[in-house]
């Protein structure tokens, strides 16, 4: 029975890839009629460069992708999908992509409102969280493709060439996929980020919307009613990074992305809360090994981030 399920899952993955190949025959990142869903194909190596992941699921149908968080490399392919349950500063790329072995996949934004509704409904229906689940949400999580996730993704992607079907059935199919994520191997991370006890994820949301202000660790701890010591411990458990390093990485990664988009160094620095351009340049070089100006002229700055 297990072998049969694996065979069916493999066939369904092949069908999903065929659909993406039809929708996106060339390299690129494209929006679909469902605003939460994007398709991508990368046919040349992209080095890992600064990025900020929003709450997202990324499913790979061909090739492999890499994300680095606090020095830890997360490499995933068609055997595992990636769940990022909260906004995180990472380095991301596809160093192995080529015309012969392109990176092909689907990127699905996690709608916080729907994820919260589902997570709380699941907790209410099934009772209290199991003891093993009662830990802070993990940062990046890689999960094995299971039957529910594979079928939900196929049912979602197959809609995309029919605008009427997409408009009418798309929101329901997205909800089905979110439910599969909350049930699957990444359930602990996803349910703790969106369900009861999601203080760290809420703190990160607060920081993301106040990035150009002088947010302190005390501000973040007060936002969720914790002492500084408890907040620091739980934050590092959830993200692997200290709150201070997280704030710095979020600002610098956002600034790096703005520079890559064509902003000047001064504009990027001010946009993420730096009052001193020289301090920004020093911290940028310390983190990335290049000054902002050097980085803006490098091949990395022009790479399309996915």
Regions found by a protein language model. Give the residues of each.
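Short, basic, alpha-helical segments at the C-terminal edge of helix-turn-helix-like DNA-binding modules
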Residues: 197-198, 247-256, 294-306
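Short helix-to-turn junction characteristic of helix-turn-helix DNA-binding domains
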Residues: 207-210, 258-262
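N-terminal regulatory/effector-sensing and dimerization cores
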Residues: 29-128
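Residue at a beta-strand N-cap/secondary-structure junction
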Residues: 66, 214, 262-263
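An amphipathic alpha-helical interaction segment
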Residues: 132-208
